[in-house]
């Protein structure tokens, strides 16, 4: 999310392709302090406006409790992988009555992931969404190892919706579609996919972002697979 025209164009394109929620990063926790960190409060305003114009609810990442006043108009709050065990943040989100999407930590077990979710749930906020984004193993051909097996395990262990982020697991755009299809086949309730109108010019995560046309192709492929996806049946 880099400018008003860019986010507006992408918002309308993904809406036309079937997206149900618009995600944009205004506060971006980056590995390097020298890379693009997001547009901050201005970015939140651009995201909310783009979502309203496209008719989509919006989601963005919160990295610190102090950002809550800036995020009052955001429909869903995201807790990133690096903050999965930021317990003061999780407790604060537990006091809200707004959906929270919790991403699995980079090296977290499924049990640790679920216990992190309990911090939010135990505060009274029952609107928690789980997101598998891959774990670091050092052995994966992609940037992270997408734990496909975690999808049915989480679905069996909890009533919470389970989403998958194939983009961050892949790290490369050409791997996003196969990982998305694997996640859909394993029973994921939804996908979070990075899209950019010009990935080669993106200020962050351009290598894993799909073009608007590629996102359209992904949604078509996933929709074709869904009738055959696992839905909790015993083998």
Task: List each language-model region with its residue ranges.
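Active-site-adjacent beta->alpha loops and helix N-cap segments on the catalytic face
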Residues: 4-5, 32-46, 65-66, 81-97, ...
């Amino acid at each position: 999310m880099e400018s008003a025209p860019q986010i507006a164009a992408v918002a309308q394109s993904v809406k036309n392709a079937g997206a149900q929620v618009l995600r944009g990063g205004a506060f971006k926790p980056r590995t390097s302090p020298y890379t693009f960190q997001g547009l901050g409060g201005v970015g939140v305003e651009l995201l909310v406006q783009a979502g309203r114009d496209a008719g989509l609810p919006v989601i963005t990442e919160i990295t610190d409790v102090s950002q809550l006043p800036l995020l009052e108009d955001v429909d869903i709050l995201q807790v990133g992988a690096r903050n999965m065990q930021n317990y003061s943040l999780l407790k604060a989100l537990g006091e809200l009555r707004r959906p929270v999407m919790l991403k699995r930590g980079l090296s977290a077990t499924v049990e640790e992931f679920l216990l992190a979710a309990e911090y939010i749930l135990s505060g009274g906020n029952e609107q928690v969404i789980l997101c598998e984004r891959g774990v670091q193993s050092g052995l994966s051909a992609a940037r992270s190892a997408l734990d496909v097996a975690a999808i049915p395990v989480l679905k069996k262990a909890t009533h919470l919706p389970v989403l998958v982020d194939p983009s961050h697991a892949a790290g490369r755009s050409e791997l996003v579609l196969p990982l998305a299809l694997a996640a859909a086949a394993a029973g994921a309730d939804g996908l979070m996919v990075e899209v950019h109108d010009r990935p080669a010019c993106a200020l962050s995560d351009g290598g894993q972002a799909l073009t608007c046309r590629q996102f359209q192709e992904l949604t078509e492929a996933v929709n074709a697979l869904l009738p055959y996806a696992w839905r909790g049946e015993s083998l």
